[in-house]
């Protein structure tokens, strides 16, 4: 009888310890999409800034946000925003590919007047200069296909 009580007590203690340990470890992890780089930017902020700059045709900002933007010879480095449009209602699906790459699927629900509904795929990568949008061009179709049929790591919208 004493052995049975001792076994139950040890089993209960072990379960409680495992539960406590898993809760402690789970809370210490930061979602990659919310992680800040040295400049204090998150991948999500970079993606949203890029989407806004693209809508406003703000080449100057786009070149700051993309990898190797300073080497670009197509976009005008001095061209700021050509309008002040913004997406008021959107939904974003976030797919963490690995610790250095996050893919975003941006969907505008109600685009600004005279603008078509926008569905964009944007790849944000970690660089030695912080998080950057990988390229002004959309990711390759095979890269999109790799994540599009999986469950998003996270979802958020303009209402969050």
Q: Which ranges hold each PLM region?
A:
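Bacterial N-terminal signal peptides that target proteins for export
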Residues: 2-13
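Core segments of small alpha/beta cavity-forming domains
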Residues: 29-75
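A mature extracytoplasmic/lumenal domain signature
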Residues: 51, 66-69, 96, 106-110, ...
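Surface-exposed, charged secondary-structure patches
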Residues: 78-126
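Low-complexity, intrinsically disordered terminal/linker segments enriched in charged
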Residues: 134-160
């Amino acid at each position: 009888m004493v052995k049975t009580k001792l076994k139950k007590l040890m089993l209960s203690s072990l379960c409680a310890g495992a539960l406590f340990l898993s809760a402690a470890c789970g809370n210490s992890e930061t979602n990659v999409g919310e992680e800040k780089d040295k400049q204090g930017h998150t991948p999500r902020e970079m993606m949203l800034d890029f989407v806004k700059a693209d809508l406003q045709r703000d080449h100057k900002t786009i070149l700051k946000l993309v990898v190797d933007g300073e080497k670009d010879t197509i976009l005008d480095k001095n061209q700021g925003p050509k309008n002040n449009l913004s997406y008021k209602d959107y939904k974003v699906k976030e797919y963490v590919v690995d610790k250095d790459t996050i893919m975003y699927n941006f969907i505008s629900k109600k685009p600004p007047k005279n603008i078509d509904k926008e569905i964009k795929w944007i790849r944000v990568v970690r660089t030695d200069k912080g998080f950057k949008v990988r390229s002004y061009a959309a990711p390759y179709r095979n890269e999109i296909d790799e994540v599009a049929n999986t469950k998003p790591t996270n979802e958020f919208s303009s209402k969050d």
